[in-house]
């Protein structure tokens, strides 16, 4: 029962519903009340704090997805914004790196988080993926300057469509997909030229949203082709937080910011057991070691593929659809 209670609560049963719901199965003498959930949330807050203070020196995160997720808080006029970082370890497995309360567009909020992770032993990721509006980018250039940047195509696509009339959406969407689904970077650049030719005269602002960020939109093509589907969007965060948003919608939001952070942490922790490794996980260690990939294929294999074991300021070893 100690394992069932958290699952029931996390997946949508409000604390006020516990007693009548469980009495249907266990009888009126079950002795379970909403106070049990109050104790559980306090326990989850302790677990979230311990997670946020853990040592990071033993784990190497090669890829990093970042985003700021807003959740409604019942007892607070402002929404809670969770700064979330999910990483891909050198063995190809996905893992929650950090989650904290902050401001999505604030460089200082992200810098505080990154500095704390670095202090606890985090090594600079090779590549970070996120929305261009995040304050993360200014922060990562300061804390981990060698980390490469990839803008999320999911967010960019939405930004471009917002600058176009609805009548142009179907053709624009098809043209955008030709860019990020291209066979290689050369064909992606040809698709960009086609998009510019089709929409540039009438909608220059929409086209500029892609052409102005082209380098960081096409960065993912420099990595293994098997990883492209993972690296072009922040879908791992979006899909994970679909569960968090559903849970908070059922209960009309957590009662406090601390409870919201703890609930999100526990939901992600529960979901992590179902996360699959990235495609071709053996190639992640090669990326960390500095292997060169051309058109998605290994061009130059480094002699040393041992992941770094100590924190650095960012130095790296030498040697279909949006998803």
UniProtKB/Swiss-Prot annotation:
Residues 300-323 are annotated as: Disordered. GO terms for molecular function: DNA binding; transposase activity. InterPro entries: Transposase_mutator. Pfam families: Transposase_mut. One of its GO terms (biological process) is DNA transposition. Residues 304-313 have a biased composition (Low complexity). Keywords: DNA recombination, DNA-binding, Transposable element, Transposition. Required for the transposition of the insertion element. Belongs to the transposase mutator family. This is Transposase for insertion sequence element IS6120. It comes from Mycolicibacterium smegmatis.
